[in-house]
Amino acid sequence: MRHQCRVPQLGRPADQRKAMLRALTTQLIREGRVTTTKARAKALRDEAERMITLAKDGSLASRRRAMGYIYDKQLVHALFDKAPNRYSDRKGGYTRITRTVPRRGDNAEMAIIELV
């Protein structure tokens, strides 16, 4: 039984779920905003905020952890250059989730997640 298991399953096996969240995190950092389902946006928020917190730390160990998660190495370097200046006054809450219209095919709740 899954009593009080806080990990969102997202209807996928663990390996597919991790790969999807890595891809969404990479896209969010690259583009600045992503349109996805509300459940995926909420799961993505945790991962994106963790990567930005690592970038604010700026240590070599943090950079290596981010490189192991984000698919694009050049994007990691850009994130570590920009994040400390952009988010220096924030202690968290680097993303914003805005609900949009439901998806046409299956009426799934959609949301836009963007970097603040």
UniProtKB/Swiss-Prot annotation:
GO biological process: translation
Disulfide bond residue pairs: none
Gene3D superfamilies listed in its UniProt record: Ribosomal protein L17
Keyword Ribonucleoprotein included in the entry's annotation: yes
UniProt similarity note: Belongs to the bacterial ribosomal protein bL17 family.
Subunit structure: Part of the 50S ribosomal subunit. Contacts protein L32.
Name this polypeptide is given: Large ribosomal subunit protein bL17
Phylogenetic placement of the source organism: Bacteria, Bacillati, Cyanobacteriota, Cyanophyceae, Synechococcales
